[in-house]
A protein has these predicted regions:
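Residue-level recognition of conserved structural "scaffold" positions that shape functional pockets
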Residues: 71-72, 93, 118
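Generic secondary-structure signature for well-ordered alpha-helical cores
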Residues: 3, 7, 54-57, 101-112, ...
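A short, charged, Gly/Pro-tolerant segment at domain boundaries
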Residues: 117-126
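C-terminal helical cap(s) of enzyme catalytic domains, especially alpha/beta-barrels
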Residues: 20-34, 76, 88-113
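Alpha/beta enzyme core
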Residues: 1-61, 67-85
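Short Gly/Pro-enriched loop/turn and capping motifs at secondary-structure junctions
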Residues: 66-68, 90-91
Length: 126
């Protein structure tokens, strides 16, 4: 990817989903298909970031279901250099700013000098 000019990659965004009313048999979503996002996609997003990290050597922006500072740490451990928050901003636009102090406290408690030390620090089972 880097050889082709890619400076970074983001993963993932909303997944396509649908839902139907069992009584009317009509879609609950006017356009039939809609976006599935938020905490429901976090495990998929984490797996994709880890998969990408194992294949490329460029920064990865982790996206998908980040609702608290622990989610940020988890995305960084699997390889994200940065994160993007979507759904949470609709719930509480001030939440991302509040997470910074929690991240700082985590780093202090775990003797982490720079948060970037977390990026790709996963330990896989033998």
């Amino acid at each position: 990817m880097k050889d082709e000019g890619g400076d970074a990659v983001s993963a993932i965004n909303t997944l396509v989903g649908t839902s139907f009313n069992i009584n009317t048999r009509k879609p609950k979503i006017y356009n039939v298909f809609g976006g599935l996002s938020g905490p429901a996609i976090k495990p998929i997003a984490l797996a994709k970031v880890l998969e990408i990290k194992r294949k490329v050597d460029i920064p990865i922006i982790g996206i998908g279901g980040i609702m608290n500072w622990k989610d940020i740490i988890e995305f960084m451990i699997v390889g994200a250099s940065a994160i993007q928050i979507g759904t949470l901003n609709f719930i509480d636009p001030t939440a991302p700013a509040k997470m910074i102090s929690d991240l700082e406290n985590y780093c202090i408690e775990n003797n982490i000098q720079k948060i970037s030390e977390l990026t790709g620090s996963f330990i896989l089972p033998n």
